[in-house]
Curated annotation (Swiss-Prot):
This is Chlorophyll a-b binding protein 22, chloroplastic. Coiled coil: none annotated. It comes from the Eukaryota. Transmembrane segments: none annotated. It is a multi-pass membrane protein. Photoregulated by reversible phosphorylation of its threonine residues. The keyword Cell membrane does not apply. One of its GO terms (biological process) is photosynthesis. It comes from Pisum sativum (Garden pea). Keywords: Chlorophyll, Chloroplast, Chromophore, Magnesium, Membrane, Metal-binding, Phosphoprotein, Photosynthesis, Photosystem I, Photosystem II, Plastid, Thylakoid. Belongs to the light-harvesting chlorophyll a/b-binding (LHC) protein family. The LHC complex consists of chlorophyll a-b binding proteins. The light-harvesting complex (LHC) functions as a light receptor, it captures and delivers excitation energy to photosystems with which it is closely associated. The N-terminus of the protein extends into the stroma where it is involved with adhesion of granal membranes and post-translational modifications; both are believed to mediate the distribution of excitation energy between photosystems I and II.
Length: 18
């Protein structure tokens, strides 16, 4: 799962988005 602080596809609407 996408969690803040982890580079993940923003398509999930989560993560920092970096």
């Amino acid at each position: 799962l996408a969690v803040p602080g982890i580079l993940v596809p923003e398509a999930l609407g989560l993560g920092n988005x970096v």
